[in-house]
C-alpha cells in the first residue's frame, strides 16, 4: 500500500512540475527572457522523454531556434540543427500537416546560413507550406506559418493575405483552443505577425484597439509594450510629419 502511495505522489509531483514548468516558460516568453528556455531545453534529455513530451519539447526548440536566429546568437546554427534533427526523429508521431509546417520553418531559418542555397530553401518553404495547408488548413499553427510566409516575402507576399491567415488563426485559438495542445506561447507568437500585418493594412485606431485587446488578456506581453507599440507609434509620427510637409 505504501509503495502505491509513493507512486501516486511521484506521479502527482511530476505532473505539477510539468505544469509549473510550462507556466514558467510561458511567462519567460512574455518577458522576453529566453535564456530560461535555453536552460530548459539543455537540461532536458530528449531520449528519455515520452512521445507526448517530445512533441512539446520540439515546439519549444522551434521557438528557441527562431529566437536564436533573430537575436544572432552564437549557437543559432546549432539550435536550428538540433531542432531539425529532432523533427525528423519525431516525424512519425506528428500530424503530417504539422510536420510540413515545421519543415517550412526549417527552410526559412536556413536562409540565414545557407546563402548559396537560397533558391533551394525558398522552394522548400513554398512546397512545405503548400503541403501543410492542404492537410491542415484550419490548424492555427499552420495558419500562423502561412501568415509569416506571406508577410516576409518582399516580392510575392501579401500583407493583406498575411493578415487574413492570422486573423483566422486568432479566431480559432479564441474559440477552439481546447482542440489544440500547443503550449500557450504559440498564441502570443501568432499575435506578433497579426499586429505587424495590421500595421500595414489597417487604421491606427484598429491597431491600437487590437493591442489593448491583447494586453487586456495578457498585460505582461512585453513585445507589444516594449517593441511593437513604440516602433509603430514612431512610424506613425513620421508619416504625420511627411503629410504636413506636402
Report residues per predicted region.
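Boundary at the C-terminal end of the N-terminal hydrophobic targeting segment
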Residues: 16-18
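Extended amphipathic alpha-helical interaction segments
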Residues: 119-187
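Amphipathic alpha-helical repeat scaffolds of TPR domains
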Residues: 20-28, 47-69, 94-113, 138-154, ...
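Alpha-helical repeat scaffolds
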Residues: 37-47, 75-90, 119-131, 159-173, ...
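Short coil turns that delineate tetratricopeptide repeat
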Residues: 94, 137, 174, 216-219
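Short coil/turn connectors between adjacent alpha-helices in alpha-solenoid helical repeat scaffolds
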Residues: 27-35, 65-78, 108-122, 153-163, ...
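Terminal, low-structured helical/coil segments at or just beyond the last alpha-helical repeat
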Residues: 179-246
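Sec-dependent N-terminal signal peptides
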Residues: 3-14
Amino acid at each position: 500500500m505504501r509503495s502505491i502511495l509513493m507512486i501516486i505522489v511521484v506521479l502527482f509531483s511530476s505532473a505539477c512540475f510539468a505544469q509549473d514548468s510550462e507556466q514558467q516558460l510561458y511567462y519567460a516568453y512574455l518577458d522576453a527572457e529566453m535564456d530560461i528556455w535555453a536552460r530548459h531545453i539543455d537540461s532536458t534529455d530528449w531520449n528519455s522523454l515520452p512521445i507526448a513530451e517530445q512533441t512539446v519539447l520540439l515546439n519549444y526548440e522551434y521557438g528557441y531556434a527562431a529566437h536564436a536566429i533573430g537575436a544572432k546568437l552564437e549557437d543559432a546554427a546549432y539550435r536550428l540543427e538540433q531542432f531539425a534533427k529532432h523533427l525528423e526523429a519525431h516525424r512519425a508521431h506528428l500530424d503530417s500537416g504539422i510536420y510540413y509546417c515545421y519543415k517550412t520553418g526549417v527552410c526559412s531559418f536556413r536562409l540565414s546560413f545557407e546563402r548559396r542555397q537560397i533558391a533551394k530553401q525558398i522552394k522548400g518553404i513554398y512546397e512545405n507550406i503548400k503541403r501543410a495547408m492542404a492537410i491542415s488548413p484550419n490548424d492555427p499553427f499552420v495558419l500562423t506559418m502561412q501568415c509569416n510566409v506571406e508577410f516576409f516575402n518582399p516580392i510575392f507576399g501579401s500583407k493583406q493575405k498575411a493578415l487574413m491567415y492570422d486573423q483566422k488563426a486568432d479566431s480559432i485559438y479564441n474559440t477552439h483552443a481546447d482542440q489544440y495542445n500547443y503550449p500557450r506561447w504559440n498564441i502570443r507568437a501568432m499575435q506578433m505577425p497579426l499586429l505587424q500585418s495590421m500595421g500595414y493594412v489597417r487604421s491606427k485606431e484598429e491597431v491600437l484597439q487590437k493591442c489593448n485587446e491583447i494586453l487586456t488578456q495578457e498585460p505582461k506581453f512585453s513585445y507589444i509594450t516594449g517593441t511593437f507599440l513604440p516602433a509603430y507609434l514612431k512610424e506613425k509620427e513620421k508619416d504625420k510629419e511627411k503629410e504636413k510637409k506636402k
